[in-house]
Amino acid sequence: MSILRPSKEAILDDLRSFVLNEAEERTGFLATAVSKLNVVRRVQQGQKLSFNEPYLALILQGKKKTYIADKSFTYTAGDIVVTNLSLSSRTVVQEASFEKPFLSIVLTLDPLILSEVARRYGFDASEQADAPAMAVSQANSDFLLAFARMSRLLQEEQRGLPFDKFYYEELMLRLLASDLGRWACDLISPDSRVSKITKAVEILKKDFKESIRVGRLAEASNLSLSSFNRQFKTLTGTTPLQYQKQLRLYEADRLLRFEKRSVSQTAFNVGYSSLAQFSGDYKKFFGVLPSQVCPHAS
């Protein structure tokens, strides 16, 4: 006796309804009541700069193109996207409208849980991608159904029960078993290039306001200075000091937009000693002067 399975399009339709119900009229990157589970709804086309932690995303509707250094990645409905490193990227929403918004589900990747799932089910974490820190692939029906089960935690109000951990681990298992599994292994293998560079990234994220020697980052990554610089740029598209500057500017943007800090206060809070240098860097990165973002901040 055969058991009827829903079609991929039917599963995607259910997940679109879930995201629309969860987002209501809100737009942007939206956290849900389930840990690590987020939804995205965008109604306008255009470019956006963003800084993202490692994630697994399922695209439900619309089209995006992401640029990391000299590489680009295009994804649309039914695609799975994975990143295994904290990255700054330029993303262009190519298809989105109020009537038909861009929709996706985004899971934050937890290296500890991913590593435990890999160990429990015997995945060889030493199999590495040796490729950019982002990858795109088509989701199969099993992957889509795993996302559907995770989404029902909100629909059926099962929050707080062990189901959230169970369904999250199932998605990590699906990821490891997919053709994107090598990117996931890069995140958890201690000998992978991603894991080594991640040690430097963690220092940069923690001490981005301070002056940091590149030699210190290379030592933390257990790489020679030349190898470290080469591998860092291959993965992130920037030099370590450019990466640090981006961290400062993203934090400055947050302080200006959401905490309404003054430009001078913001500049010094993120590690700049020169207000003119800060204003110049901010405009070059975001396209506007910081004084235009929050002109009335005290």
Region annotations inferred by a language model:
Residues 2-9, 116-170, 174, 202:
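Amphipathic alpha-helical segments enriched in hydrophobic/aromatic residues interleaved with Lys/Arg
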Residues 142, 156-159, 209, 258-262:
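Alpha-helical structural elements of signaling/regulatory helical domains
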Residues 26-126:
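N-terminal regulatory/effector-sensing and dimerization cores
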Residues 157-160, 165-167, 173, 182-196, ...:
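Structured core of small recognition/catalytic domains
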Residues 174-180, 189, 205-207, 211-250, ...:
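Basic/polar phosphate-binding segments, predominantly the helix-turn-helix DNA-binding elements
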Residues 139-142, 167, 192-200, 236, ...:
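N-terminal positioning helix adjacent to the helix-turn-helix/winged-helix DNA-binding module
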Residues 1-33, 128:
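A short, N-terminal "cap"/entry segment at the start of jelly-roll beta-barrel domains
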